[in-house]
């Protein structure tokens, strides 16, 4: 499931604009000189907004909805494949899972952040490929994938079940 909080949260990552006095100002509304001087075309991220809200929105709120919808149970998850952009978020992610009583022990986690870095939108595919190569899987095992998107506070959770050893 893909869950977005774009309708509730301010923009966190953007390009071609800036925020002035809590208003979003497009590059189209300024002169070329001002656009260049203010680096309006550079990608920007409100790190304070991100740090204060990413786990609450994309883990706690989103996963609680899915726990109710699909009757998910943490002890039925054999592996957890989270994407996070920085090691800074690992403990915060764990705390978020604990806050909603859905703790998945870290020995069940697999990520390749240390070896591959933040590979952005390709991350879950790269993680899955490495995971399938490294772990012998058994039919019926469940793999929960977590993919947040910080620009508009969206997240995707995928629950995969092993069939025929894959």
Task: For the regions a language model picked out, list residue spans one by one.
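Condensing-enzyme catalytic core mediating Claisen C-C bond formation in acyl metabolism
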Residues: 1-53, 159-166
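Claisen-condensing/thiolase-fold acyl-transfer catalytic domains that form or cleave C-C bonds
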Residues: 52-63, 67, 78-166
